[in-house]
């Protein structure tokens, strides 16, 4: 199957996310504190859609080989095992009657190092990183709840342009479904 048309749609969405980030950064330069070697976002837990996983896999296979690839895959396996345990605990908590909001908040507080983060705290696939990573330092909304990077200077109670992550995930899901 030729994934190229779907990957192009994903790349267009990624570029749009980059443009939104830059507009917010230009409008609020004192609030957006993203900089090279700041890896706070590289420990956040989030899911990838099918199209994002395919895109990252394609770029990963094109860039890495041999021992370097093996080392990165081992880091990915370790992160995956940690995340699996966290998800399993979240499922048990849900079945035990813990409110879903509390579970999601607890998961949001967890920190797992991204396997693409190198020893210099730089992303080895930065140009091809997921959309969530591209938007992390600006105000976002997930399920109607506003979120910001803890290192940013956006103030609670003030109004800022906010990216609706649910809409972006909806578009990512649409592209992913087109693949099937």
Regions found by a protein language model. Give the residues of each.
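Short loop/turn segments that flank or connect secondary-structure elements
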Residues: 1-180
């Amino acid at each position: 199957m030729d994934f190229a048309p779907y990957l192009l749609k994903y790349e267009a969405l990624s570029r749009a996310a980059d443009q939104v980030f830059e507009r917010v950064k230009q409008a609020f330069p004192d609030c957006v504190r993203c900089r090279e070697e700041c890896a706070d976002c590289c420990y956040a837990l989030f899911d990838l859609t099918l199209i994002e996983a395919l895109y990252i896999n394609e770029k990963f296979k094109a860039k890495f080989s041999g021992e370097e690839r093996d080392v990165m895959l081992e880091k990915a396996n370790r992160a995956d095992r940690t995340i699996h345990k966290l998800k399993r605990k979240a499922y048990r908590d849900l079945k035990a009657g813990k409110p879903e909001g509390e579970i999601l908040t607890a998961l949001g507080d967890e920190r797992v190092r991204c396997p693409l983060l190198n020893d210099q705290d730089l992303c080895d696939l930065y140009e091809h990183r997921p959309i969530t990573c591209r938007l992390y330092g600006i105000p976002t909304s997930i399920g109607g709840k506003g979120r910001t990077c803890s290192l940013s200077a956006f103030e609670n109670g003030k109004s800022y342009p906010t990216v609706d992550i649910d809409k972006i995930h909806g578009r990512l899901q649409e592209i992913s479904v087109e693949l099937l």
